[in-house]
A protein has these predicted regions:
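Acidic-basic catalytic patches of nuclease active cores, encompassing PD-(D/E)XK
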Residues: 1-20, 27, 488, 524
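Long recognition/docking surfaces used for binding and targeting
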Residues: 151, 158-281
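Active-site beta-strand-loop-beta-strand hairpin of nuclease catalytic cores
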Residues: 22-34, 82
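Nucleic-acid nuclease catalytic cores
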Residues: 41-86
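Conserved S-adenosyl-L-methionine
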Residues: 293-422, 427-439, 503-506, 516-517, ...
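A conserved structural/catalytic subdomain of Rossmann-like adenosyl-cofactor enzymes
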Residues: 45, 414, 418-614
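Domain-level recognition of nuclease-like catalytic cores that cleave nucleotide substrates
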Residues: 70-108
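Non-catalytic accessory regions of SAM-dependent methyltransferases
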Residues: 98-164
């Protein structure tokens, strides 16, 4: 570890408190850094999360962690479990006073100690379900069935006195019905117990506490009306329930009792589930179903939150019904990666903004979980994963719902959203008039064209057409959905709202798509040098490397496109932040994602550069 000691001293951490073959503790002022060396070949998210979680149990909790395997490195802000581009120099004494420290309670420490155990259990349970081939065909099906059983356990904990109301189970308490020890009795009819659990699921899956209420009054339950527990094997039910319920004892207020998942503090359970999804999800690019890499979602949210903090009232403002006005959307939300990250950042922001008033923070954040986070997707399986993911982060009724088409859904209202974070599907000619649905969609995107003239109204849609050589807008027979989503998101944003989206590079560079760029930011006046006539202010473009979405099968080179909807037509285009990410922290070999570490993630330094310049 001598090389690492020399490097950390060079940064300014001159005091070495402890040193071993795989662990060094260094101090600069009052700031602590732990350098941890692992023999693992890859610094996977699970490994990094496990190490950081263990550090959170220490007293004192270190400020930063430098995790390495000798080749790859990960740098972490321990308190916020967040990747940073490098270990910063120690703070000055004045800065130390402002730094602040997060209070770590006994409950927090117990939760952090449980993190690795639960991560191992979740992996084993997923594998058990997948290997059983019990009405599951692939790893994603196994995740879905596991989601249903997690939901059942969450319901049991939160509604212990709930009595079933239908059929032969009427009058039975859910807490007794779902208790794993029922399977351990010698005289137990184990198959009958399984059938009781499956029957109970049909009744409780639409319980009001897990039904989101959309702004148009529509109700959105977690599960489809036809959803049922597919699993039938006794072994699976017993092992899953035991793993979720047998968490040992916990002491609270001087009393020792059996712990439950609800005793886990913060987002520990949600983080466990999120790592499971990212580790086990099978990308199906041909179906347009794949996960946005964690490194991309974190960078996008970090950049947007930096700008939002300049207008703090926007996040905390309440409407006449005392509900948050602030709204975030992902119209192609998948498993909810962007929305989960945004929820975590909003939580931290409110903790700081409302410091000292715990009750107000809890009330405000509860309302934000129900009213500020909106997601839509056309895949029932992805909506299930997103809703369970949100529920495990404490947002049981987040407004995430299934829609046939986010491009045209009436449930998404114009000028409703402050922020949009999204990775829409893209395919040249992907929406075509050859299908009736495609024809209807393209017609929907021509409502702002009158006699060949683009009216460019704030809520108008135009990109179901394109201008000819004389500037007259005419209908097109097909269009890349990514282009239509640019138009749709401009419509859905409030004036001044921010959108960060993944787009294929062709939209930004192809000569044939120039009209899209001009629609977005306007044409350049060669005399004044100003861009005129656009609907948005382009804030930034970050080019992503080819391998970013190679597992999806899309194969297209992509970029992050960041823009603000104009607050008024005369708003001027300023300078545009441009960057190229050569690496995003992983590569793909033989269709497998290989983690390279944070020092191979250009996005961390790019976002840091954006923050310093803006």
């Amino acid at each position: 570890m001598k090389d690492y000691i020399e490097k950390i001293k060079a940064i300014g951490y001159s005091k070495i408190i402890e040193e071993s073959d795989d662990h060094v503790i260094a101090k600069g002022g009052e700031i602590l850094v732990h350098i941890i060396r692992t023999d693992e070949k890859e610094l996977t998210p699970r490994l990094v999360n496990t190490i950081v979680t263990k550090l959170l149990v220490l007293d004192p909790v270190p400020n930063y962690a430098w995790i390495t395997n000798g080749e790859a490195n990960s740098y972490q802000d321990v308190m916020f479990a967040k990747a940073i581009p490098e270990i910063p120099a120690p703070l000055t004494r004045e800065e130390e006073k402002l730094f602040g420290r997060k209070e770590i309670t006994k409950r927090d420490k117990w939760s952090y100690l449980m993190y690795e155990k639960l991560q191992t259990r979740f992996d084993q349970l997923h594998q058990l379900i997948y290997d059983s081939r019990d009405s599951v065909d692939n790893t994603n099906d196994a995740i879905d069935e596991f989601c249903k059983l997690i939901f059942m356990e969450e319901f049991r904990i939160n509604h212990p006195d709930y009595k079933l109301k239908k059929g032969v189970l009427a009058g039975k308490k859910i807490k007794d019905l779902l208790w794993h020890e029922r399977f351990e009795k010698d005289d137990a009819d184990k198959k009958a117990i399984v059938e009781e659990i499956r029957t109970a699921f049909k009744e409780i899956k639409d319980h009001p506490d897990y039904v989101a209420h959309l702004d148009d009054g529509t109700e959105a339950p977690i599960f489809d009306p036809d959803s049922y527990l597919k699993l039938g094997k006794v072994e699976i039910y017993y092992k899953v329930l035991k793993a979720l319920q047998d968490l040992g004892d916990i002491s609270t207020n001087g009393t020792t009792r059996q712990a439950t998942l609800n005793d886990l503090s913060g987002d520990v359970l949600g983080r466990v589930f999120d790592v499971l999804i990212r580790g086990k999800f099978e990308n199906k690019g041909g179906m347009g179903i794949y996960l946005t890499p964690r490194q991309v979602t974190e960078a996008a949210v970090d950049m947007v939150m930096h700008d939002l903090k300049k207008s703090p009232g926007k996040i905390t403002k309440l409407d006449i019904h005392n509900r948050p006005e602030f709204k975030v959307l992902d119209g192609c939300c998948g498993s909810g990666g962007f929305l989960i990250k945004m929820l975590e950042e909003l939580k931290q922001y409110l903790l700081i903004e409302l410091a000292g008033d715990r009750k107000q923070w809890e009330e405000r954040f509860e309302k934000m979980k129900e009213h500020s986070i909106v997601g839509a997707d056309n895949s029932p399986g992805m909506i299930l994963k997103a809703r369970i993911n949100m529920a495990l982060h404490g947002a049981n009724r987040a407004q995430i719902f299934k829609t046939e088409n986010s491009l045209t859904s009436p449930q998404l209202k114009p000028e409703t959203f402050d922020v949009i974070l999204t990775n829409p599907p893209f395919k040249s000619g992907g929406i075509s008039e050859k299908s009736s649905e495609g024809k209807t969609t393209l017609q929907f995107f021509r409502n702002d064209i009158e006699d060949g003239v683009n009216q460019k109204r704030s809520t108008g849609l135009s990109l179901g057409s394109k201008p000819d050589g004389k500037g007259k807008w005419k209908p097109v027979s097909s269009m890349d959905p990514a282009i239509l989503f640019i138009d749709r998101y401009l419509q859905l944003l409030k004036p001044g709202g921010l959108c960060m989206m993944v787009v294929p590079d062709g939209v930004l560079s192809n000569s044939g798509d120039r009209y899209v760029r001009e629609y977005l930011m306007g044409k350049k006046n060669e005399i004044t040098g100003e861009f005129e006539g656009g609907k948005a202010i382009l804030k930034g473009v970050i080019s992503l490397p080819q391998e970013t979405f190679s597992l999806s099968g899309a194969g297209a080179k992509t970029s992050l496109l960041y823009f603000k909807k104009k607050e008024h037509p005369g708003e001027k285009q300023g300078s545009v932040f441009m960057a190229v990410a050569d690496e995003v922290g992983f590569t793909v070999k033989n269709k497998i994602e290989v983690q390279l570490g944070d020092d191979h993630n250009s996005l961390l330094k790019i976002i840091d550069s954006y923050k310093r310049g803006h």
